[in-house]
Every structure is written in C-alpha cells, then in structure tokens.
Amino acid sequence: MDGQEHAEVPNSMVEDDQSVVAAEAIAELANSTGEPNPEEGEEQSVEDELIAKAQKLMEDITSVANNPNPNILHALSQLLESQESLFLEENGHFSNARGSHNSGKLCILIRENDEFFELISSTFLSENSYSTAVKAASARLLMNCSLTWMYPHVFDDAVTENFKNWVMEEAVKFPGEDSAKKEASDFEMLKTYSTGLLALSLASRGQIVEDVLTSGLSAKLMHYLRVRVLKEPSTSRIHTTETKHVSLKTKEEGRSRVRKIVDTVEGDHVLETDSGREMGQTDVQPDGEFEIDGRDVFNVSGVVDCKIKPGDDNSVRDDPSRHRLNRSKSRGRGRVHEGAPDTEVLLASPRLGRLLVRDRDLSKISDGRNAEDVTVCLGKMKSGIMEIEREDNDECFQGCIIGTKNITDLVKRAVGAAETEARAAHAPDDAAKAAGDAAAELVKTAALEEFKSSGSEEAAVSAATRAAITVIDAAEVSRNPTCVTSDQTTDVSEVSLPDIESLAQLQEKYCIQCLEILGEYVEVLGPVLHEKGVDVCIVLLERTSQLDDRSTVSPLLPDVMKLICALAAHRKFAAMFVERRGILKLLAVPRVSETFYGLSSCLYTIGSLQGIMERVCALPLVVIHQVVKLAIELLDCSQDQARKNSALFFAAAFVFRAILDAFDAQDSLQKLLAILKDAASVRTGANTDRSAPEVMTSSEKQMAFHTCFALRQYFRAHLLLLVDSIRPSRISRGGVPSSMKPNIRAAYKPLDISNEAVDAIFLQLQKDRRLGPTFVKAQWPAVNNFLASSGHVTMLELCQTPPVDRYLHDLLQYAFGVLHIVTSIPDGRKAIAHATLSNNRAGIAVILDAANISNSIVDPEIIQPALNVLINLVCPPPSLSNKPPLAQNHQPVPGQATTRPSTDVAVGTQSTGNAPQTPVAPASSGLVGDRRIFLGAGTGSAGLAAKLEQVYRQAREAVRGNDGIKILLKLLQPRIYVNPPATPDCLRALACRVLLGLARDDTIAQILTKLEVGKSLSELIRDSGGQSSGTDQGRWQAELAQVALELIGIVTNSGHATTLTASDAATPTLRRIERAAIAAATPITYDSKELLLLIHEHLQASGLGDTASALLKEAQLTPLPSSASPSSIAYSTTQEMSTPLAQEQWPSGRANSGFFTSKPKVCAHDEDPNSRSNAALSAKKKHLASSTLEMPTPVAQQQWPSGRANCGFCPSIPKINARDEDPSSRGNAAPSAKKKQLTFSPSFSSQSRKQSFSHDALPQSTQRINCCSNSDPALADTSETAAELVLKNDLDADAQFKTPISFPRKRKLSELRDSSVPGKRIDLGERRNSTFADGSGLQTPASALDANQSGSSRLGQMTPASQLRLPSDPQPSNPERLSLDSLVVQYLKHQHRQCLAPITTLPPVSLLHPHVCPEPKRLLEAPLNMTGRLGTRELQSFYSGVHGNRRDRQFVFSRFKSWRSFRDETALFTCIALLGGTNHIAVGSHAGEIKIFEASSGSMLESVSGHQAPVTLVQPYVSRDTQLLLSSSSSDVQLWDASSITGGPRHSFDGCKAAKFSNSGLQFAALSCEASRKDVLLYDVQTCSPCQKLTDTVTSSRSNPYSLVHFSPCDTLILWNGVLWDRRIPEKVRRFDQFTDYGGGGFHPSRNEVIINSEIWDMRTFKLLRSVPSLDQTAITFNSRGDVIYAMLRRNIEDVMSAVHTRRVKHPLFAAFRTLDAINYSDIATIPVDRCLLDFATEPTDSFLGLITMEDQEDMFSSARMYEIGRRRPTDDDSDPDDDDETEDEDEDDEEEDDLDRILGLAGDNSDSGDDDLSSEDNEDSVSDFDEEADILIDGDFMEELIEGENEDDGNGEDEDDDDDGEMQDFMSSGEEDDYRDNIRSS
C-alpha cells in the first residue's frame, strides 16, 4: 500500500520547529476549552482567538507542505472536536445550526482556505510521499470539517480510490476486531476515517458507487457489523469479488465496466490466496507493526512478507495539475450534514480514552544498527511501489563480494535510498531503476578501489559504508529541505488521539452510512444476507432504541433506520425482516423528532411492496392497528418528509381491507382532511400579496398532493368493497343462493383499484339495472363522514388551484377523482350541487372552470376527470331509467304495442354469447338514462326516485347558470390539438354525455335546438376517422358517435339513437330533418286500381300476356293508353335493344327520380336463373311468414289502410349491369337496400348490439335486430324484416365484404327514416355524393352508386341474386316479409319528402304521375326589382306587395359611398359620434382630446383636452335645445355642452367609465372602475348626482371587458354582461346564458327581444329564439327606425392596440362592417372598408354613417370618415350610377343574378372596388324567406336553408315567404306590423 512511512535521516531543525508549533497549538487548545466567559465582549474575543489559532495552524502546515507534522493536523482536529462537543451539549445531537456556532465557523474557515483545503483533501491523501500519520490526520480533519458541508465534496478520483483501497486493506483490521489491542495505530485511524470519507463520496453517487459495488466492500463492512453487533468471532472473509494481486491495467478495466445485476451474489467470492498472511505478521509485531522508539507506528508487513501491494503504483503521480481542487465539484447534489446532523455525534469527537504519544527526537535511538535496519526496511518499503521488485540475483547486486566480505546489504541500502529519492521526485520507473543502478555502482566502485589500493577488506567495507551513507544522506536532504519557521522555544506538548473503542464506534457508524447508500443495489443483497444482515439490523434497532439517562435516543438510531429502509427495498430482506418480528421492533422505537423520518421511510418502503404488506396484514389485528396508529401519528408530526412518507404509505396500503378497517376504526379520515383543509386555506392566499400558486410552498404542495392521492385510493377501495357487498348474488349449482355464504374478501389480500377496475365498476353501475338501484339505496358511511366534514368543499377549494406545476396539476386530478366517486351517490351529488366556497364561488363553477378551454389551451388530464364529475351530476345512469331497456333507444309512438315479439326473447338470449345462462337483468343500451328515475317497487323507492330527480334537476340548473353550456360547446370545436390522438374524441364524447344529461331538461333541450347543436355534432361525426375498434381512439369514436346521435335525436325531436338520427347527423340543416319528419307523419293513400294497372304492365313487359289479360279481366281494369305501354327493354332477352331512357314509358319511369334512380341495363342470359331465385326466395318468405305471423296479409286487397307504416324508403337501387338486369331486380332492390339500412342501425345504438352486428365473430343467429311491433304488425314490417335478416346472414357469410362502419368525411349523408317505428330504416333518396358502409361492409346507398355519381361500388357490378347467393345459402327462419303495399307506401313517402313544402294532409296519391305538393304562388309579393316595386307602389298597391319594405331595406342598406374624411396628423382617433341636426361630428383621441369637425367642409372647429387617458366612448344626445356630449375614458366620464366644448365640461364623474345615455336622456349609466366590483352606476343628467347602483353579486369569471351598458327602449330595464335589471326592483331579473366569451348585445327596438352576442332571447318567456352566427363577436347599433342592424367587430375599447391583435386581424370583419335585417336577422350585406375599423356611429336621419378607421397600423394613424347610405361609388365612366337611367336595367339584372349568392351567404364579399367603393350590388334580396317558411314548420328557429347541389332544392320560388301570418304570430317582435303601418303612413 501507499500508506507506508518514509525511511528518513532526521533533520533536527525541522523536527524542533514542528514540535514547538504543535506544542503551542495544543497548549492554547487546552486553554480554549475552559468555561466560556458570560460577557459578550469576552465571547467575541474567544471566538476571534480560536479563529486566529486555527489560522496559525493552517499556515504552519502550508509552510512545510512537503514534510508536514501530523500533530499539527491532529491539534486542529482537536480544536474542532472540542467546539463540536460544546455545540452538542448546548443544542443536542440533531440540531442543524452549526453555521452560527464556533464549530461551524472554524469549519468554514478551513473550507475557504483553498491552499490548505487542497492539501488535506487531495495532496496529503493522494501523494505516496506522505506518511500514514499525515494521511490519518488529514482524514480525521476532513471528517470534522464535513459536519458543516452544505453539499458533499467531490474528491479526486485518486483520493476516492485510496479511500476504497485503505478500507479494503486486509493487512489491517478494523478497530475493535482484535480485542487484545488497546491502542489504535495510524493505519487503523486512517482506515476508520477513510470509511467515513468513502460514505461522503458515495453520497454524490457516480462511478465510485459502481467501483465499490464490484469490489466486495459491502461484504467487508457487513462482516464488521456482524462481528461488532452480534459479538460473533471474526473469521476469514471471502466476500470479495476480485483478487488482490492484479495488475494496474486489470483494475482500470474493471473500473470502467458497468456492473451487472444478478439474482444472487453469494457465489461470486474468491478465496484470497494469502489468507494466512496475518498470522505470519505477528512474528514481527502484532498486526505487522514496528514502533520506532515509541514515536510512530509503521506497518512493515509488506517488508516482512516481501510482497508488493498492487495498489502502490505510480499512477497517482501522472500530472500534478490532476490533484488541484476543482471548486465546481464541491457544490454537489444536496445538503448532507446540515439537514441530517444526526450523522455526526459524540463519536466524531471522543473525549475519553485518548492515547497520548510523545514526540521524541530521532537522535535518542540507542542502537544505530537497528536504526540502519529500519532505514533499510523503510527504503525497501519505498522501493516497494515498484511494479517489478529487484531480486537478489539482480544485476546491480552482482560483484558485491570483496575478498571474503559481502557488501550486498550496503548496496541494497544505497539502491533503495536512490530509488526512493527518484520516486519522490515523480521520476518514472526507468529513471528510478537507473538511479538505483548508479548508486549500486558507486558503492561497489568505492569498495573495489579501496580494496585494490590498500588490499584491506575492512577498509573496502568502510569505503562502501561511506559511499552508501553519502547516497542515503543525499536522498534525505532532497526529501526534507530545511524550512525554518518563526522562533519557537516552547517545549513539545502532547496531542490527543482517539482510542481503539472510539474508533470502533466511529467505524460502526461509518459502515452503516456506507451500507445505507449501497443497500438499495441488488449486488449488496447477497453479502448482507450471508452476513446475517437482518439479525444485525434488528439488534441494532433494538440496541439504539433504548433511551439513555437524559431520555434521548442514540445518535446512531436514524442511520440504522435508514439502513433498514434501504435494505427493505429488496423483497427478500423485507420478508425476513417481517418474519423476524421487525415490525414490532419498529413499533417500539421512540417516536421523537429524530426518528420520525426513519420510521416513515420504513413504513413507506414496506407498504409499497404488496407481497410484504400481505405478510404484515396477516399479523394480529392489534399489530395492524398499531401500525396504522403509527402512520397516523406521523401524519401529525412536525417533519414534512415524514408526513409525506406516511401519506404515501396509506396510499399504497389502502388496497388492503385490514388497513382500511383499522384506519376507519380510529376515525382517521379527519386527519387526511385536516391536512388538505390546511393546504386549501393556504392556497386561498389570505392576507398575502402573492398569487395562489406562490402562497403554497413546495413542501406544502407535495404534502397536499400525496394526501389527496391517498384519499382517492381510500375511496376507490371503499367503492370496490361496497359494490362487492351489494352485488346481486348468483344462483349456485345446487340452487342455493350464494348469499347464504357471503364471499368476503380476505383482509390481507390486495384489492384491484386501478383505473381500469374503477372504470369497470362505474360502467357496471351505469348498466346493471339490479346493481344500480341497490347502490343508490345503500348506505356508505365513509362518504357520509366525508360530506359531514365538508370534505367536498375542501376538494373544490383545491380544484381552484391553477395547475402551474406538476404537483398542483396532479393534485387536481386526484381531487376530481375523489369527487367522481363521491358524486356517484345522491347525497354527494346534492352536496356538490349546493356547495359554496370560501370566496363565494359555486362548486359547479369550479368544476366547469377546470373543464374550460382557456386561450386554446387543452389539458385533457384535468378536463377529463372534471367532465366525469359533471356526468355524475347531471346524467342519470341508464340503470335507473324509467323506460324499459329496449324502449330506451326508441321513441314511443301512440298506439305502439308495449309487448315485445316473441323473437326478442330468443335474440336476447342468443346474443349473450358465452355469458352464463342465468337470469340477468337486461341492461339499458343508452349512455344516459331518462329524466324519470325508476328504482323498483320497494318501499320508499318512489320518494327516493323523486329526490334523485330533484337533485339532477338542480344540478342541471347550476351547470346552466354557470355558463356550462358555453364551456361544453367549446369542447365540441372541430379542431382541438392535443395528444394522444384519442384525446379529442374522448373529451368530445364526455362533453356530449354531459349535454345529453342537460338535454333531459326541456328548457336546455330547446336551447340546444336553437343553437343547432345537431349540425355541429354531424360535423364531428363526419370528421372522425374510421379507427379500429380495438384501439382507444376507435373506442372513443364509437362512443362519440353513439352519444352524439342520441343527443341529435333529442334536439331534433326525432327520437333516440336510431338510424333516423344517423341521417339527421348527416343532414346539413334542420330544415331537411323537419321536412322528412313531416313526410314520415303524413298518411299515404293511393288508388289500388292504379297499382293493378302497373302490375298489368309489368306482366306484359315480362312476356306473361295471358296472366296480364286474366288480371285485366278479373279486376275489370281499363288498360292504359298505348303511349303509356312500356317498352320491353327492361326485360328483353336480346341484348341489342338499347332504347334511350327518355323513350321508356313504363310506369315506374313516369315519376321523376322515381322508383329506380339508375339507368336499367339488361342481360339476357341472367333472366331465368334470377327469376327462379326470386321465386324460391318468395316461396320461402311466404312460408316463414305464414308460420310465424298471427295475422296474415290478405292476398287481394283493394284499399290498403293509409299510414300503416311510418317508414322511410330507399327509392333507388344500385347500378345494375346490363347483363344482370332481370325481373328479379325489382324484387331484390328493396330487400337489398333494406338489409343494408338495418345493418347500419346497431352501430349507433347500444354497445352490445353494435358488437353483435359488426363482424361475423358471433353466430349468425345472434345477428338479429330487435324490433318492437307496430300498431299493426301484420301489415307493417314483419315481412320486410325477414327478408332483411335473410340477406344479412348471407352477406355475413361472405368475408370479402366485412369492413368496419365508417363515416365519410365532409360529405353529405342521406336521410334515414323509420320503416316500422322502432327499427328505423335508412332513407337514401336525398343522398347524392356519399356512401355508407353497413355492418357487413357493403355500401348501402344506391344513389351513391348511380352511374353519374359513383362507380366504385362492388355491388353495382353484379345482380342482387348473384351478389347475395340466395339460391345456394340456407335461409334462417324469419317471421316478417316485405309486402307490395309497404314498397309502394315507402316510394310515395319518398316522393312526398322531396316536396319543397310537404303538407300533412294529402288526397290519394296517383301512382301514374309524379307527386308534387302544391306550392305557394306568391302573387302578392313585391317584385324583386326596385323599379318594379316603385311601379307597383304607384299603380297597384300602396305598399308595393308583401315584403316590399324589407326588400327596400335590403336595397338601401347594401349600398354605401364614402363622402368625406377627417384627419389630424397629430392625433390618433379612437371613437366618433355624429351630432344630429348640427352638421358636426365629435371624435375622441388616444391623447384624451375631444375634437369637433364640420361635416360639410371637413375642418376642425374645436379641440379640448378633457381626459388624462385615451377617450373610449363619445355619445351625443339632444336635450331640448341643448346638444349634450358624454365622453368616457378608462378612469372618468365628462359631460359636455357640444355647442361649446372649449368652455370645459359641465361635470366630471370620477371612478366610472364606459358611460351611455338612456333613451330619454335623463340618466346615463356607467361602469365602476374597480376591477374587483361589478357595479352599474346610474347618474341623473340634470343634477349630475348618482341615483342608483346595480351590483352583480355572482362571483364568476364570465365578465369581459367588451360589455357595455344598454337601456331598454322604455328605460326601465338595463342590460350588462348578460344580466338584466329592472330599475324598479333591487334584485336582478334574469341572468341570460352566454354561449361564447363575447358578452354584450342590446335590446331590440321592438321591446320584446334582447340580443346577447349572437343569441336572440324572448323577453316575455326568456327562451332562446334563435342564434345568429353573423352577430358573433360583434358590437351592434340599430338605425333610427330600428329595422336595420349595423354590426362591427367587437374590441377592447380601453386598449387601442387590441384592435390589431393577430387573431382579430384574421376575422372577416376586421376591415368591414355588416348590415342585417332587424326583423328576421338575415344578412343584408358585408361592406369592406379595407382598413381596421375602430368605431361606428349613426345619425337620426339614416343618411350618413361615421367610422373611425386605422389608416396605418405601424404608425398608429387613424382618421374619421362619413359615408352616404343608399348610394354607390361612381365608376370610371359614370359619376353616379344611381342617377343614370342607362345602367338601371343592368343593375337590376345584376341584382337578380346575385340572389343565389346572397342565399348562400356570399353577400358583401365583392370588394373589387377601391377604398371608397362600399357598394354591395348583390344584396337586394334576403335569405329571410327561408326563415319565414321554416317558422311554421319548426317554431321559427331556422336561419337559412343551404342549397345542397344538383338534383336537390333548386331554390326557384322556395326562397319566397309564404307564412307572414305565422311569423307575426310566433315573433311579435319581428316588426312585420311596423312594415305595414309604415307603408300605410307613406301612402
């Protein structure tokens, strides 16, 4: 080893100086340890004296750095230890306040002396030239200094390697291992302190840990603890993983290897080859030590054994710069000893048992010969660092015989001294060997020369001796240069060194510290178990847990518990620890502040291992209760980390019923809630200026996070146990209910409370109609206690925390997880719905805020659990539904039979597949139950159901009142960019479920209908891509489709989740849905003789002339005219016949878009087989029908009942190939289409039905469709369903057509309609451009396969018979079949649906001619042309016809011409007002100025500075003869006399803003400037005093800076921010729902409507009338008559820069304004101004407009402009086209040509003109005609009907209004009467 001493020739001067210094330091140290002076001044002087002494000692060391005296280092260590002892006496062993004590100050002083610290931490420990005593003293001093290190010091690699080698040194035992020794050697001291320093190095992790793990050190340390603790005799240790005698290269390679984790390491030990060496060492001295005159102890075992230590290489002498202290390394990972002062205790500074060793002069050696021998030994030790030892037969030792004398010893001494000198100078091995050779040659040469000259052998030996002494002296001189210090005359004193027992105690502690760091690694487990580590830990725990005389625990106890915690991470160790009653030992540990962390760490480590916790839970109940009690006490302790560990223990242990029961038995829930309540109270930030996230410290956040997680686990476990306890028992095999033997979960078995398991429980509670009602009625004490303690309020308080960091983010998730479980019971829902937080916020508002998308930021991990809570609050589960399971998905029809067909039972039982054949309550197929709750017929069920309904109703009202609809609609936005891809569909599906629950309320359903939610949902369904059902995305898409269709069925009044709603979702407008609904409800009748005539034609065309004649004769029919006789092209046997379709006159071709939509093509050779196939099919269907139906359909029936089947029908068939067309095609078209329709339905109903119809994984018998019977089942759909199912099973057998159901993207889908009532069919008549894939993969809509539109269908390439393989496949039994009557009725219904205005009462419909409902002629309407209207007004009617005024408005207010501009180069205009009747305009500027301009000349008349802030609003009002002007800024309001503003304002109003006059001008309203208050202040204009204050007391986040105050026309009502006040009563009247973040709006001049952003509300009923998308985000102004609305893009008036915000620039109205008809809210025009629009103003005569536009956004320059209304910009060749007669006709033609563009919403987009071209020539007509036509149909809530493309509503005449009377009845505020009155007055 490199810890050997030098061989040195004494230098008396150096020794004396160092001895004097050490003696003086020790003497002063003894004086400094006396009693402290109580006076402050003397204490300061003592402190200064100590620092001076320490400084002096350091200087003494640094001055002789090459040859330091270890006693000085020991003196400095003694100084630190004495001060540490004083600190411990004053503060105890666990204080961390050393920094302010003398002990800490001395350590800091040493640490900050870079030169000295470099010596003791690197140079002395890494250089081989320093003695063991110096290294031991340095290590001792470093350990004393480490007490105050904030971070672990990072030692050099060479130093850490030496630490490891010294600890691993086998030649030296650990202190205390040899009981015979009483004194500690330097090497033992070095080994002990190296162990401590190694523990410090391991704390910084890194490569040193890898090296130590592979070195077998852990086994050595554990063995020592075993010997010390268990008092077992020391034996040879074999736990080393490497041989000691290895080369340097091997060691370096081993260091770089990464350790491998192995299962066992017990066999990886190599027996050391020289294990008997220790016995041989005792021949020299015990443990191989020499004492030289009692001064120093040197280990010379290497000399005696003639063995070279492998670690004593020259690798540490590579580069001196390597040993420089790297200051950056000393700032490590964390605080080591300040935070855990228990690691250094009295053991670090033992005060007893010191060994006193006197320094003696080397000259007192009595025997020079012995001294020479020792010198030789030392020299040999110095040379022992060579890798290759010089052998006795070495060349340099040859020729040492002089005569008879042998001078080999002298030569060896000289060689050793020379090589030692060379190596001390860091010379390489070759140079050292050369030096040795030279010294040998010198000695031999001197002897030979003397012998030759004198011939005397004695003289030759003397000469050789002198030469050898010369070499040795030279080496000593070079090694020990003379360093004379200051004069010191004091005698040498004695130094205090730790005795053997003190070192043994320190060694024990350092071993524990090392193992506590290494214990978590698997490599340590084997050695620990081999050395009885479990017993050692238990004994240590028991021994250190004993209290001493001062009732304090052992300082070693925290380290022992840390060691147990580290080793308990291994299951093997933990299991043995529990088996050997280690838990009881832990429970016996004193519970004081010093042990809290260790106890909590052990509990958490054991609790996190479920296998170990099973053993713990199997212990006696008393022990389990004590464990839980201990964890609860730790929750209340003062240490944060211990509290966190305890919370984590509970979170991991709550999966065991034993822990759960013990926890509840001690009423411990209050402890968890108390922690969370404290965190919630801190989170509110009371009495602090910091924000909520900053109020909570990091530790508080972590504690709240862990506690909330534990609470969620607690409720999850309770939920699982409760459901298990109430789960309906199944019948055992013996017929005895299993409830007779309750299956109680074992208390020691873990519960599965994972996310998947909890989701499965909630799904079961939702679906199971037995378990659901039982769960509602069950008592849940845990939740009741939680609610009684206001735990739900605490959770909501925590949910208000913004998720700004990870802990708060996860805290919200767990809090919502708790609320999700709590709201599953009625009491929890009621408590949450009525909860009010400390800041007066509603609990529902907090949940909605968490689910809100703010600033396009989507956090699905927060939104999803929040939506789950909302679902529990507003959505009754289907298991509590009042409706039967099957009726859940189908809207009942009057007269429908309530009993299910007998086939339903068979289908229901077969569809269960492998389910147990036990009676199971049928589950509801929907996702949300009905409004009515049904809990069975038990006692009290009705009352409880009523209470549940009331709670759900209150929750819905609370969600609506807190803008819940707006938040949920945001989640349905088509573009939500979040990851993973399934997340948007998940959030949308959950949001739809919440909306579906809200829609159980009729009022909310009506609102959703008006908001056209169905249209948004249809877009979502079409956008969702087809994903595999096995993925999360596919699952969420399927659920989204299901719940969206169910919601559409409610908001469109078209039933629940049926195929009809699929059609509704695919339809772009509600108008089409209503039209289909009217047609479906219309009874259809027809003349049966016309049908017989068609059959007669069909028979003739088929070549059955005799049969046709017989029919003609028997039915007494008159044949159709010959012109109507059909050509036989459809059924010809010759392929050459190709008569055009226009010439074909067969009956079905008479109807335009009739029975077949595609062009028939024939093929001769396919006629007969298909005819036979259809004949067989018909016979089989007839047989099946006769065997199952009780009421067979009559064969001959002259008059079929009308309206027998309210069913839709597909009138078109796939394109048939010419060679495939035959008579069977007519028979197969309907069943083929119907089959495909039915297979679409299950995918949008229940999950079970969707699975049974998706693929052929189930038997064909399970793939049936349950259909409730119609009022007349014999005549309805029984035959249809049979054929459908026959064909479906055939198709399912063909795997090539099995593809998943998918929606086409962004394409229009066909309408679907019910063919019987429950089993709705797909009506594909109106589909043009899309296809649908049914459950078997076939594309269903025949219209999509039309030759002109689609050619991709495989079905269209073959005949139905060959496609479906009817002849060859067996047909299953089917009780229903198609009838000719149903086919005809469906065909006629389809024709009726195509009518533009279908009516509900029809005469018998002709089969021979196309059916078209009569349309209004609109003869009384005013002409579209303006000239025509003027002429009509003069000649025919005083009002020029119906809608004359409306079309005049559209004509006038679509034309605007720039008239004049007003600029001021020095001002930025912000607002404008037109002063009526004065020809003046007033503008406000950003500088706070008010400027008056003359309108006619554009010159500025007056300018005055009235505000300190930018002017935001100016509003004029004429009061008698005075023109008043009201100006506002962000801080005050000024009232001016507009006739002379230079005289100053009439009055100033501070503390208010955004003022607006009332309509009477007697008052004005303003808003309070205080951001925290929501007050509307009313002032009297005459007295200028406040007259009223209206306050919005609801604390919500709905307020926005855009809202202004609005007065009603009669000034009695006030509207602001969606809140309506009546000035005559103190409270608010109404809070309107807001569906966007843009508040504002205003009162309609008709007084019956109020506008909130884009929604129109009825003032009389407070119902939503309609939604006008054109008004979204706009600020509106009415013209003077109140029949036209001007809309400009809303902005924050207090910030002019907000006008040019990036998002605002992209809006279409950024540089434009819009005009709308205020009667029906239809768009008139969108007028571009090509500049950013800031403000807008009107004047009473409706002749001019005033605008403020920003001319230059970069320079922020704006101007005011005035526009003429009703005039257009002159063109290049015509100055005024409105006055030019030559262009009038052309203008009118343009207007008529652009009518369609206006209907399509394209009005106002023509901006080809220049900056002043504000005309809109294509906006003379309005889209309102559609609206008024729809008013009669669906309550007047439709805004417009979009033209859908070719072959659809062409709009000719459809846009005209035919229901003005209905409109006036439904909307009294629409003002149509005003039009008539105005016309009358004008006449």
From Swiss-Prot:
Report one GO cellular component.
Cul4-RING E3 ubiquitin ligase complex
Q: Where is this motif: DWD box 2?
A: 1655-1662
Single GO biological process annotation from the record: leaf development
Check the record and name the SUPFAM superfamilies matching this protein.
Answer: WD40 repeat-like (SSF50978)
Residues of the LisH domain = 1087-1119
Source domain of life is: Eukaryota
What's the protein here called?
Answer: DDB1- and CUL4-associated factor homolog 1
Organism of origin: Arabidopsis thaliana
The organism's lineage is: Eukaryota, Viridiplantae, Streptophyta, Embryophyta, Tracheophyta
